[in-house]
Curated annotation (Swiss-Prot):
Component of the acetyl coenzyme A carboxylase (ACC) complex. First, biotin carboxylase catalyzes the carboxylation of biotin on its carrier protein (BCCP) and then the CO(2) group is transferred by the carboxyltransferase to acetyl-CoA to form malonyl-CoA. Residues 40-294 form the CoA carboxyltransferase C-terminal domain. It is found in: Cytoplasm. The keyword rRNA processing does not apply. PROSITE patterns: COA_CT_CTER (PS50989). Its main location: cytoplasm. One of its GO terms (cellular component) is acetyl-CoA carboxylase complex. Transmembrane segments: none annotated. Its EC number is 2.1.3.15. Keywords: ATP-binding, Cytoplasm, Fatty acid biosynthesis, Fatty acid metabolism, Lipid biosynthesis, Lipid metabolism, Nucleotide-binding, Transferase. GO terms for biological process: fatty acid biosynthetic process; malonyl-CoA biosynthetic process. This is Acetyl-coenzyme A carboxylase carboxyl transferase subunit alpha.
Amino acid sequence: MARRFLLEFEKPLVELENQIDQIRELARDSEVDVSQQLLQLETLAARRREEIFHALTPAQKIQVARHPQRPSTLDYIQMFCDDWVELHGDRNGTDDQALIGGLARIGEKSVLLIGQQKGRDTKENVARNFGMAKPGGYRKALRLMDHADRFNLPIISFIDTPGAYAGLIAEEQGQGEAIAVNLREMFRLTVPIIATVIGEGGSGGALGIGVADRLLMFEHSVYTVASPEACASILWRDAGKAPEAASALKITGPDLMKLGIVDEVLKEPSGGNNWAPLQAGDTLKNALEKHLSELLALSPDELRNNRYSKFRKMGKYLESQSIESEISV
């Protein structure tokens, strides 16, 4: 059994994990009944893991969202989608591997799936550009979404990116324009759109496939206008203040629910989705089927109008006059 990658704040679980592994090896190599001891240790480990993850800070949630063993877009597709057929290319000479898309069925419903895809190791991450799509990736996604609109297929997007690729080649190819066009065109689509933040939801890279009728996110996912490291570097010229930036940015599910940005926060298994990926897949499938059935009951005009209103209401501000009144009181 492959050893799990433990984050720094999970290190108190290392000793328990080692004891559990030793008892399992003993059970394999002998006829001694160790089921009771194994159950006690696993129960204790689960309880401690629950305590640790219940008290995570925003900065620690980012570590969970970036966990190398966290389920990816392709993992979820393999878990609960049937007849998956990947579609390639932006019809302009590129086929960005950081952003994938294709046709599949969820239950009895045919859908279009798009999402960022990270790698499991260095080689895969280089091939996938660490989930950071170039302009061709967003143009590919738009081509596929137009296809879905033409054939009346609901669109399901999986968001998992630190942000759109910011290299020179991306700027030369029109990164900002590609994302902006996606934002505009997604408001015009007449089919249901459901987006789920399965890991990181970073900046314009997430928004490029994130204009949706329903926005879901997992409990330990994050959705942010900029990475805390970038925010700290810009505001305080010190990337070491990323934990403070993470708290200020309001990047977690509960905060985003209060702000009216996220429609549902999906509970994760104890220890995060990487500890029980199949359970996470069941949770996501059930949520997608529920929201999809609700959205399919709406007309194309209702979908577009509601989508526009949802995003129009986002954001809060304070009038300077009311601030002055509060100070004088």
